[in-house]
C-alpha cells in the first residue's frame, strides 16, 4: 500500500475518532442537565458549536446571549484552549469589546482532555453572568486576578467603582441582544439555534399541552414535524461511516 493511501487512511480514521469524542462531549452535556444554557455542534463542522444562555437573576437578569465555541483542529488532544465568541455588545470584564471573545484563563490554564470538558466551559459561562464580581476575583489557582488581565478594563473599572453605571451598561447589552434575537441566521447551518416570535396560531396548542398536568397523555398532532434545527449525527451513523471507510480501505489494499 502506498504512503499516500496510508496517510489518507490515518487521517480519515482520526477524523472518525474525533467525531466520537465530540459526540461524547455532547452526550455529557445532556447528562449534566445544565439549566438555562444550551450548546450543540454545527451540522457542517463538529469543531464549531452554537450556544445560547438564558439568565434569570442578577445584573444580567432576563437576558439571552448567543455564543459560539470553536474547538482546536486536533481537539481534544491539543492543550490549546477552545475559543468562545459572544455576539456583539455584551458588556462584561471577561468579554473583549473588540473580538467579543471570552477569557477562559481564570479557570483554564491549558486544556487536558482527562480533566476538562465542554460542559465545564458552559458552567463557567453561567458563573461569569451569575456573579460578575466573583468571576474577576480569583484564578483557577485561587489567586487574585490582576486588574490588567481582564478583557474589558472599562467594565472592570465600573464594576469596581460604579455599580449603577455598570448595571446600566449590562442592561444595554440585554436590550441589544433581545433586539437581534430574531435576526436572520448569519450562517446557513441547520443546527443554528433559531428563535421565533410567539404566534398564537402556531404555538398556542403546545402552550396548552405544557400547562396541562397530564400533557403526556394528550393526543399528538398528526401534522408533519417541523424542520429540525438542532440535530447531530448519532453514534449509529458514525459507526456506519466508520465501517464504510474501513471497507473502502480494505478494497484499496486488495487492489494494490
Swiss-Prot record:
The record's annotation in CDD domains points to: UEV_AKTIP
TM spans (from-to): none
Please name the SUPFAM superfamilies in this protein's record: UBC-like
Q: Which residues belong to any copy of the UBC core domain?
A: 17-179
Xref: InterPro entries: UBQ-conjugat_E2_core (IPR000608), UBQ-conjugating_enzyme/RWD (IPR016135)
Say which family it is in.
Answer: Belongs to the ubiquitin-conjugating enzyme family. FTS subfamily.
What this protein is called in its record is Protein crossbronx-like
Amino acid at each position: 500500500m502506498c504512503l499516500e493511501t496510508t496517510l489518507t487512511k490515518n487521517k480519515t480514521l482520526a477524523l472518525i475518532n474525533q467525531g466520537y469524542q465530540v459526540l461524547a462531549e455532547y452526550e455529557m452535556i445532556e447528562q449534566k442537565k445544565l439549566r438555562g444554557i444550551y450548546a450543540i455542534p454545527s451540522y457542517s463542522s463538529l469543531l464549531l458549536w452554537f450556544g445560547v444562555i438564558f439568565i434569570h437573576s442578577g445584573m444580567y437578569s432576563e437576558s439571552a446571549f448567543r455564543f459560539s465555541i470553536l474547538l482546536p483542529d486536533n481537539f481534544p488532544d491539543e492543550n490549546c484552549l477552545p475559543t468562545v465568541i459572544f455576539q456583539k455588545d455584551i458588556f462584561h470584564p471577561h468579554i473583549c469589546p473588540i473580538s467579543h471573545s471570552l477569557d477562559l484563563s481564570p479557570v483554564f490554564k491549558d486544556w487536558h482532555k482527562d480533566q476538562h470538558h465542554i460542559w465545564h466551559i458552559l458552567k463557567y459561562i453561567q458563573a461569569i453572568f451569575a456573579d460578575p464580581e466573583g468571576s474577576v476575583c480569583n484564578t483557577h489557582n485561587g489567586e487574585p486576578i490582576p486588574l490588567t488581565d481582564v478583557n474589558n478594563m472599562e467594565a472592570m473599572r465600573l464594576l469596581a467603582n460604579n455599580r449603577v453605571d455598570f448595571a446600566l451598561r449590562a442592561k444595554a447589552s440585554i436590550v441589544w441582544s433581545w433586539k437581534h434575537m430574531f435576526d436572520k441566521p448569519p450562517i446557513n447551518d441547520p443546527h443554528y439555534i433559531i428563535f421565533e416570535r410567539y404566534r398564537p396560531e402556531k404555538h398556542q396548542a403546545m402552550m396548552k399541552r405544557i400547562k396541562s398536568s397530564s400533557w403526556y397523555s394528550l393526543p399528538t398532532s398528526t401534522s408533519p414535524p417541523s424542520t429540525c434545527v438542532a440535530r447531530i449525527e448519532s453514534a449509529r451513523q458514525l459507526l456506519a461511516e466508520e465501517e464504510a471507510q474501513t471497507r473502502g480501505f480494505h478494497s484499496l489494499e486488495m487492489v494494490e
